[in-house]
Amino acid sequence: MYKRQLENIDYDFKSKLFETFLKESISKKNWGQYFTPLKVVRAIVNMADIEPGMSICDPACGVGKFLLEPILHSLDRLYAVSTDEAGNEKLLPQITISGFDKGFDKDEQKTIILAKANMLIYMSGMIKEHPGLTKQFAELFNKTFTLQTNSILGTLAKPITEEYDLILTNPPYVMSGSSNLKEEIAKDDALKKYFS
């Protein structure tokens, strides 16, 4: 029996493999979700001038492609690791990325789990280089992607107070359930003056 090594696999291949399995495991009909093709994501990301120190948000992040593509080829520049005199390592993100998605039942909640898994794939090389930072990477994944379960309005239900340098997103186009959204917005005095 041959031992196979799955190291040093190209990120594009990993991403494509992830996307292929993702499309197979998620029923668009049941979830009402459509994921932006990677070529479209890359075209939009390439138009953005992303630099260290920036804060980027995707309020409808899905599996996180708009947030993860910008860091793919700049991991060393955007995620530094420092070592103190005792040899302890610390992860120092040079960029802040925040992704939000909504979900009520277990199937819908899988999206945010898949976003974290996608981030794991993108950062797998760094994690391998710095195995002592596993807990810090897990905290980063959980801090980066947030699931909104309190309302069908998602991030509109609890407005985000943070300011961002850049919003990278492809917001969902909702047909079914739009009357429910309108009803929820009408109940909220702060929202109904902006959305009618």
List each model region and its residues.
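Short, mixed-charge, low-aromatic patches
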Residues: 3-4, 27-28, 162-167
